[in-house]
Structure formats: C-alpha cells, structure tokens
Amino acid sequence: MQADLFDAEQTGIRTRLGEQAWVLRGFALPWLDALLPALRAVIAQAPLRHMATPGGFTMSVALTNCGALGWTTDAHGYRYRPDDPQTGLPWPPMPQAFAQLTREAAAQAGFAGFDPDACLVNRYAPGARMSLHQDKNERDFGAPIVSVSLGLPAMFLFGGARRDERPARIPLLHGDVAVWGGVDRLRYHGVMPLAEGQHPLLGRQRINFTLRRAGA
C-alpha cells in the first residue's frame, strides 16, 4: 500500500533527463487495468526467455516481444525479426493499450505522431541488470524510444554519446514512462542490478516494456 501511495503522489511530475528526454512520473498508472491483462496474454503466447549475446553470455533479464517486429540476440548478432525464433510463429500482436499509451506518452514528451511497430518486454528479477548500451538496431533513429516501468523500482542509468561518459542515475518507479529521442536518441543507457523487494501487484520483479519504430 505504501508503494502505491508513493507512486500516486508522483503522478503528473515530469523529470527532464536531457534536451529531448523525459520521465513522465506515474503516466502509466491509469492504464494498469488494461496493461496487466494484455501483458499476461503476450507472455502466455510468447513466454519470457533468457537469450544469449553474440559473445556467449546469457542475459540476466528475461525477455519476449510483441508487435510486427521483435528484438532478438544470438551467436549471429542483435537484430529485429518478425517471428519468434523458438516457435517460428509471428510475435503476438501489440496490444492496443500498449500502442495508445505509447502514442500519448510520446506526444507529451514532444514526439507527436509516433507509431511503434516493436515492443520488447523485459522481466527483471532481483539481481538482474542491463549494461550500458545504445539502441542502434532500428532502421530509423528519428523516432523516439518509449519505456514503461511496472513493479519494483529500478535505478536507470542515462549516459552520454560515449560509453565512458558517467551516466546519471534516475529512479524509475511503478507506472513511470521514460521517453527519449531527437538529439538524445543514441545516448547510452542501462539499469543497475535490481534490488530485492516485493511489489504489491507484481511481486519480486520489475516488468519493463520498451516500444520503438524498428522497421522502415
């Protein structure tokens, strides 16, 4: 209950991360009744899995996808593909609630008209992390990235144009939506190891889904 109250108190606040980068505090909270069932349906159709990087490391974050294109990694590299490599079937359709929330969040951050075609769903268990990286597998860097946080709080790292630039640390709470694009589109970013905890709705996990325009 205390976590829910704190999340609610943050709703409507905008935290600026850069010239064209924002965190919209609590923006996803009014959408939860639609988001959570849709999320469960996506995971039921395309289960979460731990993928291996080209270097042979298994990612600590479990992931899946929905939408026309899904992000994957294996020994051959990072790429988007229209089908689930485990089944050969198309990824689940992007839920309408995901797409509409994304369009509205993007517009609030100055990116009206954003139309995502790819949604990467990440599940962080305690201890899972995401190393600093750039999102460079998309064909068009003109579209923003919209990232929705649900469940346990995480410490988001938002760096600069080079990996060696010291990143800012920004807490992301249940319902927060981060949006970055334009001059900030290729900034390095990551997530520190998730702290142990128990969220009243989602338990011992953080769910993050990130929407992009990956195709032409």
Specify the residue positions occupied by each region the protein language model found.
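Non-heme Fe(II) oxygenase metal-center motifs and adjacent flexible, charged/small-residue loops
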Residues: 1-216
